[in-house]
Design a protein with these regions (language model features):
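Donor-sugar nucleotide-binding helix/loop cap in glycosyltransferases
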Residues: 1-149
């Protein structure tokens, strides 16, 4: 891996069901939107330093719910269509568990989360300190891991 990887890739906030649900709601596969448009339509905050639109689109992609193209056209995946019909607000425990599993996939999931949960945590069943986690990640990511926000 050539680029530096930030342990805080999630921008120090967790995925919010209401925001992912809003992204799923507008993912029609037809409309091209800017980040500003998506923020206006969904109510997802998009300030200069506190933008949550793009990270939540990434979360939705990692969860296998949407596909996005760079000028931002969102379309629901087959899984996204089912979840949108059955649990559009992403409130059911089964939905949340499934989305957690999807984000941890080794292919198309969030790489670092996948590595943490699938490769590192199983070696430390009694817990792991942050310093050791960073050390393990640096071994996986060729010393490119940082904890800077």
């Amino acid at each position: 891996m050539s680029k530096q990887v930030n342990v805080n890739f999630h921008q120090t906030f967790k995925p919010e069901c209401q925001y992912i649900s809003s992204i799923l709601d507008i993912a029609d596969g037809i409309t091209w939107r800017s980040v500003k448009d998506i923020s206006a339509v969904t109510g997802i905050p998009q300030g200069t330093s506190s933008g949550k639109v793009e990270p939540h689109i990434s979360y939705a992609e990692y969860m296998g719910l949407v596909k996005s193209e760079k000028q931002i056209k969102l379309s629901r995946t087959d899984l996204g269509k089912i979840i949108y019909m059955e649990d559009p607000g992403l409130q059911e425990l089964l939905t949340k568990t499934l989305l957690h599993a999807m984000i941890l996939r080794q292919e198309n999931g969030a790489d670092m989360w996948s590595d943490i949960f699938n490769s590192i945590f199983p070696k430390y069943r009694n817990g792991i300190k942050k310093e050791l986690l960073i050390l393990e990640l640096n071994q996986l990511y060729a010393n490119k891991v940082t904890t800077k926000n």
